[in-house]
Amino acid sequence: DEVSFIKFENDKFYQTIKKPYSLLIFGSGAHVSSLISMANLMAWETTVIDINIKESFVNQADTLIELENLEDILTMDLSTYNASVILSHSPKTDDIYLKALLNSNMNYIGMMGNKKNMQRIKQEFGLQNDKRFFAPIGLDIGGNTHQAIALSICSQIEARKNGRI
């Protein structure tokens, strides 16, 4: 959320601008496009990270980061991001992305996947009580289109951001 505070005092003009909320998206398939659009409507800053970025699906993102090697993510500084979603649909890739994110101070880490695989992830990474980890990702709003999934993900992130969940 971009918030601006303006005041005029002693013949001086002061303006404080709060940094926009930042969303880090892992994966660049067709389903990511709707998430970027929805995040843009929320005035969030979006960054997409992937091994082979599919630019036609992510051209509305603010920043694109293409990794040369998957393991490069483990050495990146992710501390400037508020939230992240893992949408790569590859268990090996998802596990490495999650490992990198768990070393960050992010308030929201969401992962797409089926309930069985998400139980495995929670068990394997010891995430049963981690309040910032959401998997399967998104609120259950009953939709299954890319747009409805994007809405459910952004709604969950917004609820977490505002202390509702």
Stretch-by-stretch model annotation:
Residues 70-80:
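Short amphipathic alpha-helix with an adjacent loop that forms part of the alpha/beta core around
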Residues 54-72:
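Conserved N-terminal Rossmann-fold NAD(P) cofactor-binding segment
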Residues 28-31, 90-92, 115:
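Short beta->alpha connector loops
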Residues 112-116, 120-165:
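Adenosine-phosphate binding glycine-rich loop
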Residues 51-52, 115:
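Residues in the short beta-alpha loop(s) of Rossmann-like NAD(P)-binding domains
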Residues 1-50, 58-63, 82, 96, ...:
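Segments forming oxygen-rich coordination pockets for charged ligands
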Residues 20, 80-81, 106, 130:
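A general structural motif
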Residues 83, 88, 99-124:
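ADP-ribose/adenylate-binding Rossmann-like module
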